[in-house]
């Protein structure tokens, strides 16, 4: 953090009460004459109920969700800018974060830089205004699972319900209709071309 800029603060605090370093939380509150905007970065994988390896770049939902609640209730913050560069991750955690952003009464803007893949799509459209950089990419794909599947019919039904939750969220928070979103999600030729 630049100590010569008193109008820029870092998000979060240590238990001791001092400001938490920007590199720790990836967020900053920027004060200008026009208002106070909190920037939040969502990068790497969205970490949910399973811990990811310590060398993986992650966004932890247990850090982001209370921060979003605090921002919504704060009289000192006028709006939220979400900077996204994520490969996706935990569906439940990603949808939880997206629902919180979508339910905020303050102005919210999302900007996809690099990538907004998988569960990053609902996160991208959760803000009241969403933008994607010309050099960025987004991947829409059906819900998938790594590992052993026991009870295939039950697992398939569960996947269908999760996919429907994602589809409903995206169509409710964007201008895409269900048929178009489903068609894009199932274009396996496009996905193969995108990821090689």
Model-derived features with residue positions:
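Charged, glycine-interspersed solvent-exposed loop segments at helix/strand-loop junctions
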Residues: 80, 141-196
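Structural motif
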Residues: 39-41, 79-83, 111
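Catalytic phosphate/metal-binding cores of nucleic-acid and nucleotide-processing enzymes, i.e., regions
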Residues: 6-8, 12-21, 29-36, 70-73, ...
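Extracytoplasmic/secreted proteins, especially bacterial periplasmic and envelope-associated proteins
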Residues: 63-66, 96, 161, 165
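Soluble non-cytosolic domains of exported or imported proteins
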Residues: 58-62, 91, 153, 157-161
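A short, well-ordered alpha-helical element
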Residues: 52-78
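STAS-typified acidic loop motif
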Residues: 4-5, 17-62
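Glycine-rich beta-to-alpha active-site loop
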Residues: 83-97, 102-147, 191-192
């Amino acid at each position: 953090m630049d100590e010569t800029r008193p109008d820029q603060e870092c998000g979060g605090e240590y238990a001791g009460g001092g400001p938490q370093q920007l590199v720790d939380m990836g967020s900053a509150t920027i004060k200008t004459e026009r208002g106070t905007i909190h920037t939040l970065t969502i990068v790497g994988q969205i970490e949910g109920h399973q811990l990811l390896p310590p060398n993986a770049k992650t966004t932890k939902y247990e850090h982001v969700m209370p921060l979003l609640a605090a921002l919504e209730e704060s009289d000192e913050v006028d709006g939220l800018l979400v900077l996204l560069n994520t490969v996706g991750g935990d569906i439940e955690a990603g949808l939880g974060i997206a629902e919180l952003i979508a339910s905020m009464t303050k102005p919210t803007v999302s900007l996809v830089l690099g990538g907004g893949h998988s569960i990053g799509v609902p996160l991208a459209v959760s803000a009241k205004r969403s933008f994607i950089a010309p050099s960025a990419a987004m991947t829409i794909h059906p819900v998938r699972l790594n590992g052993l599947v026991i009870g295939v019919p039950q697992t398939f039904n569960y996947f269908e319900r999760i996919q429907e939750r994602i589809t409903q969220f995206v169509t409710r928070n964007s201008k895409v209709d269900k048929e178009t979103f489903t068609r894009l999600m199932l274009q396996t030729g496009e996905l193969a071309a995108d990821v090689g």
